[in-house]
Amino acid sequence: VIPHAPRGHITAHIADRVLFFESTGPFDGEIVEAVIRAYRPLLQRLADGGPFAHVSTFHRSMLATPAALDAFDHLLGEWRHSGLAPIANAYVAAADIEGRSLMMPIFASVFSGFSPFREFDRFEDAEAWVRQQLATAG
């Protein structure tokens, strides 16, 4: 658990080749940098075992500062460079999550050069999609 009130709170766990993040925003660059440092060993262990996927579920807000978006771009670059890229990425946010309509297109654009990305309103749909992607990957 990485608390950083009032600028983000992110927790993670792994279940059956899927890395799940629970993310409560808004987010600043410091929380994203903290995630990079804290979860890199976990991500490395997961990647060492073969293909994996990623689901982030957002609570309260998806808004992010420019510094957070820069740090996020750095995170994806590090994942790509280190061979830690998930084969699928799903973001889950209900329609009432602050900043959803603004941030989802930004995240979709950032992921476009990285690995498949889809947005969902419901966690169950996101999980089903990433599990399908994993099954297809073998």
Language-model features: where?
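Amphipathic, Lys/Arg-enriched alpha-helical "gate/interface" segment within cytosolic domains
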Residues: 1-138
